[in-house]
């Protein structure tokens, strides 16, 4: 199980542990990036491998517009921190399990091919 902390990013805060930022305002809410956005959440990890793998999971969730259903606001839509926390962990876990199962299936097919 991945261990990470999600909180609101504050300007001029320096993070020593591996981290990534996720935009929380506008129609691009959920977009991950290594550098901070003005309006963003920060996800802090214990190690670099978890950070890297979850970056791509967050990126795929953003590309599939997963976060659009959780946006609120009439003029400038935004993503609430509790909604993000509630949805991100289960989605990340599900996608990690599916990826591991896919890797096992590919390995089994390669063995059958020999």
What feature does the model see in each segment?
Residues 24-64, 68-73:
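A short beta-sheet element
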Residues 1-15:
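Sequence-specific dsDNA recognition surfaces
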Residues 75-100:
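A short glycine-rich beta-alpha junction/loop motif
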Residues 92-114:
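Amphipathic alpha-helical coiled-coil/heptad-repeat segments
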Residues 15, 35-37, 81:
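A short, structural micro-pattern
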Residues 11-12, 51, 95-97:
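A short acidic, often aromatic-flanked loop/helix-cap motif at beta-alpha or helix-coil junctions
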Residues 17-19:
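Loop/turn positions that initiate beta-strands
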């Amino acid at each position: 199980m991945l261990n990470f902390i999600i909180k609101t990013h504050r300007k001029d805060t320096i993070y020593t542990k591996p981290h990534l930022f996720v935009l929380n305002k506008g129609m691009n809410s959920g977009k991950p990036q290594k550098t901070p956005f003005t309006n963003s959440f920060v996800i802090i990890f214990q190690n670099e491998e978890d950070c890297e793998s979850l970056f791509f999971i967050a990126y795929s969730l953003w590309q599939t517009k997963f976060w659009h259903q959780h946006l609120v606001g009439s003029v400038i839509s935004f993503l609430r921190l509790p909604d993000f926390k509630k949805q991100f962990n289960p989605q990340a876990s599900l996608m990690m399990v599916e990826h591991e199962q896919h890797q096992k299936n590919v390995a089994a097919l390669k063995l059958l091919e020999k």
